[in-house]
Design a protein with these regions (language model features):
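Core RecA-like ATPase module of SF1/SF2 helicases and allied nucleic-acid translocases
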Residues: 1-180
């Protein structure tokens, strides 16, 4: 399965302009509920057959950050729901029970950090003043360079100028010097 369009956000779970909220809205437009479409609810997330998803924690078969499509949701012999996911670049379908699905998230929208190392045909990037702390040149560069064909930036023009001109990066206190 090729990666066509992805929406990048700076923030995962705070406010209306975050990855989690965008995923819900995009899912409703691209893969709405239907009587013949199986679903699996895990905590507050509803997964449907056909959803684009991402692994969030390494396991035996799949690494953190890998994406795929839910190809099947069905019950096993004990009437427990199982979710089959076909990950990009893998031949086999990987099966998850409800507990394992806690390491899966919708992937219509992802953070810029999660996008590193991946490419997409089209990138849609919301840039809002509410992302002020994340408006940095290096993040804009990362987002733009993930696109193979097209970048669509949505938001206030001023936010692009802020990001382009904000070159300082946060100083990280890793204590690396003390550990060496």
């Amino acid at each position: 399965m090729k990666k066509y369009i992805i929406c990048f956000c700076s923030i995962k779970s705070k406010g209306l302009n975050c990855v989690n909220e965008y995923n819900k809205v995009i899912q409703q437009k691209i893969n709405p509920p239907a009587p013949d479409k199986p679903e699996m609810k895990v905590k507050t997330t509803v997964f449907r057959q056909g959803d684009r998803v991402m692994q969030t924690k390494n396991n035996e078969f799949v690494s953190n950050g890998e994406t795929g499509i839910i190809v099947s949701i069905e019950k096993d012999e004990d009437e427990e729901l199982l979710c089959g996911i076909k990950f990009d670049g893998k031949h086999d379908t990987i099966w998850y029970d409800i507990e394992d699905m806690s390491n899966i998230t919708l992937a219509y929208s992802i953070t810029i950090h999660k996008s590193q190392g991946s490419e997409y045909k089209t990138v849609i990037m919301p840039m809002m003043k509410s992302f002020f702390i994340m408006l940095k040149r290096n993040l804009l560069y990362t987002a733009v360079t993930r696109a193979k064909s097209k970048v669509i930036i949505v938001g206030q023009k001023q936010t692009i100028f802020i990001a382009v001109n904000k070159t300082e990066t946060d100083k990280r206190n890793t204590q690396l010097g003390a550990r060496i």
